[in-house]
Amino acid sequence: MAARPQQPPMEMPDLSNAIVAQDEMGRPFIIVKDQGNKKRQHGLEAKKSHILAARSVASIIKTSLGPRGLDKILISPDGEITITNDGATILSQMELDNEIAKLLVQLSKSQDDEIGDGTTGVVVLASALLDQALELIQKGIHPIKIANGFDEAAKLAISKLEETCDDISASNDELFRDFLLRAAKTSLGSKIVSKDHDRFAEMAVEAVINVMDKDRKDVDFDLIKMQGRVGGSISDSKLINGVILDKDFSHPQMPKCVLPKEGSDGVKLAILTCPFEPPKPKTKHKLDISSVEEYQKLQTYEQDKFKEMIDDVKKAGADVVICQWGFDDEANHLLLQNDLPAVRWVGGQELEHIAISTNGRIVPRFQDLSKDKLGTCSRIYEQEFGTTKDRMLIIEQSKETKTVTCFVRGSNKMIVDEAERALHDSLCVVRNLVKDSRVVYGGGAAEVTMSLAVSEEADKQRGIDQYAFRGFAQALDTIPMTLAENSGLDPIGTLSTLKSKQLKEKISNIGVDCLGYGSNDMKELFVVDPFIGKKQQILLATQLCRMILKIDNVIISGKDEY
């Protein structure tokens, strides 16, 4: 009888993700966790799911594009209301579960962080690219070939953009300032402040010119402070050459306005981080006072110390004391007696702004205070608002200042917040033009120019790349079509008119006449976008599209319900 062949030993299953349970008879059985709840999408189904998610996000903010774009009202879980048409703000405040939708939010944030404007356009363009990619995938073209084709088309589009852009830098500073002013107005066209865009554009340009580093051609936004206050109207907003403190003088009898003394070049400020109080032991201590004499001796000691501190300040020549810490009523009274107006409980960041603005030094000890460490400003005054008891201190500079404050007013908090966001976008546009003075023309003119160049190149391509090039060109057409649609125009008719005009007249500044000026010449209307902003839009949208096209599997692990 032949021997039975020996069976290989059975491998033990992986029980690391399992639990042992017993039935009602006490018999053991094994439950493998996660298997029932785990979901998986792959292949075309996964890509469709991603692109539909991107399309749904883009459809929400699409109607906010352009000067005729509409606003959105966003209500947070705790009931806070935000009204805005800023793409980055809309997306950041939306509750999104889908992973691809979250990538679009990050895309918008990246554009906002890097450029500050064009956050809506970059999401609309990325969604349009993904829509075109889906059509090509359904025709049987491999996603990587589509992504490679899009990359090549993006390079061509950017090179065309570089050919057709204009440089607005001028040897005359006044002319360059005028260009910056008109560019700032373009960015404010779609915002809530569009009726006062002259005032806000002026604020943005003045702020950037005051603080910019002319040698490096850069602007430090930390030197431009934004301060909003509910009350008044948007037209009451103004630029302060200096710093605004949400404080008032420490004593109600102190003067409401401090002006330079005769023969002085300005009001002298002592900026202190040391408290106005007698010195204390560093270690834990206990002070026993057993008689009235001892208490009076202690009180006299405290008064002497306060007088020493005030003498140090006056000896240095200070007119006003700005202190990071508080001081008690006795110190406050002595400051009033010695004609030294003071401000207490000023934050560390505000102290830095004051020091930069007044060219002073922050002093940690009274003994270190000297004349050369004092800050100088043209005046300090207290401003009241309406019938409320709200007060603000304004430290103002009449000479060239290193810090500015944009003081924004509005009838309610939502308007103030949206006005601040609009002003931030405008500041970013001006900053970008200071860094790189090249501009492309708005109203979809740049996109139409790039679309025509990419379509022309598509006809020269022999392989599958031609489909990707045409898809990229059609995605670029989405921007002018959306602008036309949001302006109440016929999208397809408007696009075909723009393309025929650009081809016929061989100029790249023909765009959508969103505001009904009767002219499509964006150069004449001076509707411009910074070149670096438009270039960044193309690059970021193409990179995101490539990343999403490379995903073919989505595995969602379920939650344990045991």
Curated annotation (Swiss-Prot):
It comes from the Eukaryota. Gene3D superfamilies: GroEL, GroEL-like equatorial domain, TCP-1-like chaperonin intermediate domain. InterPro entries: Chap_CCT_epsi (IPR012718), Chaperone_TCP-1 (IPR017998), Chaperonin_TCP-1_CS (IPR002194), Cpn60/GroEL/TCP-1 (IPR002423), GroEL-like_apical_dom_sf (IPR027409), GROEL-like_equatorial_sf (IPR027413), TCP-1-like_intermed_sf (IPR027410), TCP-1_chaperonin (IPR053374). It is found in: Cytoplasm. One of its GO terms (molecular function) is unfolded protein binding. Its main location: cytoplasm. The keyword Protease does not apply. It holds the Pfam family Cpn60_TCP1. Keywords: ATP-binding, Chaperone, Cytoplasm, Nucleotide-binding. One of its GO terms (cellular component) is chaperonin-containing T-complex. Heterooligomeric complex of about 850 to 900 kDa that forms two stacked rings, 12 to 16 nm in diameter. Molecular chaperone; assists the folding of proteins upon ATP hydrolysis. Known to play a role, in vitro, in the folding of actin and tubulin. In yeast may play a role in mitotic spindle formation. Belongs to the TCP-1 chaperonin family. This is T-complex protein 1 subunit epsilon. It comes from Saccharomyces cerevisiae (strain ATCC 204508 / S288c) (Baker's yeast). The lineage of its organism: Eukaryota, Fungi, Dikarya, Ascomycota, Saccharomycotina. The gene is CCT5.
